[in-house]
Regions:
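Signature aromatic-anchored transmembrane alpha helix within multi-pass, membrane-resident enzymes
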Residues: 1, 171, 213-216, 280, ...
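Transmembrane-helix motifs of polytopic, lipid-linked glycan transferases
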Residues: 75, 82-111, 149, 153
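Membrane-interface transmembrane helices that cradle and orient dolichyl/undecaprenyl
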Residues: 110-115, 150-168, 176, 200
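Short periplasmic/luminal acceptor-recognition loop of GT-C membrane glycosyltransferases, typified by
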Residues: 362-366, 376-426
């Protein structure tokens, strides 16, 4: 069921929800394939503009997450040349999300019991937000796998003190951190696990103190390394509280109503979330600590979370577990028929309204980008640098299969920096002005392609 749901429109071009971020991620993989060389220390992507970092990025450096996922995908794509990059990248995300479902089952079975584990895995499998973000070309599906895997293995280590589980937990945590340093907000979960087993003298085991040091050495080394490429480091200070929204009424509304209640739970699913408060047992410590980590994450990364809903991927596992646990609490506390009726109604309505929110995410809003991009790919040299104005949105540039600029203006400056082609889906003043000066390769109702290296006589 989980696989079938995730295959819905998996052949979408990179032009659905958050296409700009997907395009940036996918283009790192594509540049590796094009270069026929996988240099993990110097990842490059399509955008040569100064939009991300404030500095011209003519080498196209992309210094964000450590690109081991992109490198792995590129290696497979280079080996099997008939594979479509976008389709395969989406499929890889789907497959890793299937493994995350297995890990959630194993983790919850250890903390609670098999019944809650099965239900948590099911909720994670069918939650509309989870389904959509399990087939995107982003680091998030991999981050969720490695972070939950690390927690699971750490729980096993705390329980049995096995070296294998300890080492696997470090590896999982290190890889998660290399993708998203936000994994640090899951620290309360690790601390709660330690507390649960503190009577077994786990606090005297030096390995628990070494674990965060060993796990975070790679990301600290990566962060130090990328300082050598300032033009490839996107500005990130704004993520914290760039617009001053932290703890304001709008912050509460966006994160807890618009996202959690509306987008994740479809309004009605919040009944299951609240039902968790009716049952307190030893497992609640770990789950409550997980929610504490979520709250700290929302407070610290305030603007980032409000601005982009994909930042809430981090909370998916605990949301799924809490929905499942709340459902079982209702089943336990109420009479069988009443509980069944409530569960069916709340689940059905919650899924319906959440799906209604998410289905629009699959829509392609700019088919003209696809058409224009294909035309550029067929007409111009493979190494041509392209200006594809979309107000900085890189999804249009991605469709051209070329590097370049996702924004117009200062065209002469861009030509001096190597721009060869101008393609636009808006026949605006800029396109008209360039049409007067340079040779037009194609002009249709949907787009215009101009050769910036061929001036009219």
């Amino acid at each position: 069921l989980a696989l079938i749901l995730r295959l819905y429109r998996i052949n979408n071009p990179v032009a659905d929800w958050h296409a700009f971020r997907q395009a940036d991620t996918a283009s790192v993989t594509r540049e590796y394939v094009k270069a026929d060389k996988i240099d993990l220390l110097r990842p490059r992507y399509q955008d040569l503009s100064n939009i991300q970092s404030g500095l011209d990025n003519l080498e196209g450096y992309r210094m964000v997450e450590f690109p081991f996922i992109n490198g792995g995908l590129a290696l497979i794509l280079k080996t099997f040349k008939n594979l479509d990059l976008v389709f395969f990248s989406r499929l890889a995300s789907v497959l890793i999300s299937m493994l995350t479902i297995v890990v959630i089952y194993q983790l919850v079975k250890e903390i609670s019991d098999q019944k809650l584990a099965l239900l948590s895995a099911l909720v994670y499998a069918i939650l509309p937000y989870s389904v959509f973000y399990s087939r995107v070309i982003l680091p998030e599906p991999y981050f969720l796998f490695f972070s939950t895997f690390s927690i699971w293995q750490f729980y096993l280590f705390a329980k049995n003190r096995a070296w294998t589980a300890y080492l696997l937990s470090i590896i999982g945590l290190a890889l998660a951190a290399l993708l998203k340093p936000f994994v640090i907000f899951l620290a309360p979960v690790f601390l709660a696990i330690i507390w649960q087993f503190h009577q077994q003298k786990i606090l005297k085991d030096p390995r628990i103190y070494l674990l965060p040091i060993l796990a975070f050495i790679p990301i600290l080394a990566w962060r130090e390394w990328i300082k050598n490429f300032p033009s490839g480091i996107p500005a990130s200070d704004w993520l914290f509280n760039g617009n001053g929204i932290r703890l304001q009424p709008a912050w509460l509304r966006w994160l807890f109503y618009e996202r959690l209640i509306k987008l994740f739970l479809g309004y009605f699913g919040s009944v299951f979330l609240l039902a968790n408060l009716l049952k307190k047992n030893k497992e609640i410590l770990i789950y409550a600590a997980w929610w504490l980590g979520v709250l700290i994450y929302f407070v610290v990364i305030a603007t980032g979370n409000v601005q982009h809903d994909y930042y809430q991927n981090l909370i998916l596992p605990i949301v799924a577990i809490s929905i499942a646990r709340g459902l079982l609490v209702i089943q336990e506390k109420l009479k069988k028929k009443v509980a069944l009726l409530i569960i069916i109604l709340v689940s059905g309505l919650g899924l319906f309204f959440a799906s209604k929110q998410i289905l629009g995410y699959y829509n392609i809003n700019h088919w003209e980008y696809i058409k224009a991009g294909k035309a550029v790919d067929q007409l111009v040299d493979q190494n041509a640098l392209v200006i594809a104005p979309a107000m900085g949105d890189t999804q249009f540039l991605f469709q051209t299969n070329r590097r370049g600029w996702p924004i117009g203006f200062e065209i002469e400056d861009k030509i001096n920096k190597g721009a060869d082609i101008y393609v636009s889906t808006n026949y605006d003043w800029e396109a008209k002005k360039l049409e007067e000066k340079y040779q037009v390769l194609v002009h249709t109702d949907d787009y215009i392609i101009i050769d910036l290296k061929a001036e009219k006589p």
